[in-house]
Amino acid sequence: MPHRDDPRDRALAKPLVLGDHEATITDDIDQLAEHISLTVPVRDIAPLGAAQTFRHRSSYRIAGDMGLAAACATPTRLWVDESRDCAVVLLKQGHARYALDGHAFLASAGSTGMFLPGMEYLQETSLASGLIYNLSPQLLARYLCEASGGTLHLDDALHLLRQPQAINLEHPAMQQVLFGLQVLIRTIDTMGPMQQPDSRPLVQLQEGIYALTAALLKPDDAPRALNSWQPMPMGSLD
């Protein structure tokens, strides 16, 4: 049960990017692991600090083959195994530190996101909230090639996606890209958790996320990536 007199609950109660109305403050760390496991293979999860102080809110959606998990949690340590998929982390508050492939990375809300290839990693967060979603590197590589206008070859795109990358969210092109992602994620959210993941609207929304993720990774190609994504007419969501 949440401790109502703890000021951290105010941070935990801030809106999640999806599934906010379904998420309640809880100390059930297995629930958080279950939601994150829809995007990356969680090996273990533990609170940073005394176990009795851990609390979180989390929710999820599935669009096509993509899992999206939104969460806000007190400081947490997460171990993730190797995967055939890659993942992107975008924070709304707080920061997260990553150790993978012998290197250290820092993701911070509003300034730096994180691209995670399918290698194992360790993540340690402050009191933080944000979104993680998974992608197929083979499919994402095709979107990178398309956004490049033919200057990036498929083998080079796949090589890029085998490397961890801090995403510069302060690049001039990012405002439009992040707005587009926000629109897509909100649309997925409004369709609710009971919508069939392989329904045409959700698959189209997944394709939009792929296109805009290519722009996150190659911001100089963002204009072409943005042009490749066209919002669906509202009637197609019915």
Locate predicted features.
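N-terminal low-complexity or simple alpha-helical regulatory segments
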Residues: 1-92
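Alpha-helical bundle regulatory/interaction domains
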Residues: 2-24, 34-40, 47, 98-238
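Short acidic (Asp/Glu) patches
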Residues: 71-75, 92-94, 110, 115-118
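Aromatic- and glycine-enriched beta-alpha-beta binding-site module
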Residues: 87, 92-98, 104
